[in-house]
Amino acid sequence: MILYPSIVDLMEKVDSKYTLCALVAKRARQLVAGDKKLVDIDSDKPVTIATEEVYRGLITYERPQKYGIK
């Protein structure tokens, strides 16, 4: 269970809990693949590192333009 940062604090960084989950998971996979972490924390767990990076605003996302059916 995540205690810090709280889910409420993390939700201020994204538009939905699904986006948060996808963002953290993708970043954690990048860390496992060898990307350098952007925060200096004591944890070696990729999900914890990715969560902290999102919380600090170091990892962001961009929604693609929506194309409707014409």
Swiss-Prot record:
Molecular-function GO terms, alphabetical: DNA binding; DNA-directed RNA polymerase activity
Entry keyword set: DNA-directed RNA polymerase, Nucleotidyltransferase, Transcription, Transferase
Keyword Nucleotidyltransferase assigned: yes
Annotated SUPFAM superfamilies: RPB6/omega subunit-like
Annotated Pfam families: RNA_pol_Rpb6
Function text: Promotes RNA polymerase assembly. Latches the N- and C-terminal regions of the beta' subunit thereby facilitating its interaction with the beta and alpha subunits.
Keyword Transcription belongs to the record: yes
NCBIfam families for this protein: rpoZ
Quaternary structure and interacting proteins, as annotated: The RNAP catalytic core consists of 2 alpha, 1 beta, 1 beta' and 1 omega subunit. When a sigma factor is associated with the core the holoenzyme is formed, which can initiate transcription.
Enzyme Commission no: 2.7.7.6
Family the UniProt entry places it in: Belongs to the RNA polymerase subunit omega family.
Protein name, entry field: DNA-directed RNA polymerase subunit omega
InterPro entries on file: DNA-dir_RNA_pol_omega, Pol_omega/Rpo6/RPB6, RPB6/omega-like_sf
One Gene Ontology term, aspect cellular component: DNA-directed RNA polymerase complex
Catalytic activity: RNA(n) + a ribonucleoside 5'-triphosphate = RNA(n+1) + diphosphate
PANTHER family found in the cross-reference section: DNA-DIRECTED RNA POLYMERASE SUBUNIT OMEGA
Any one biological process term the GO annotation gives: DNA-templated transcription
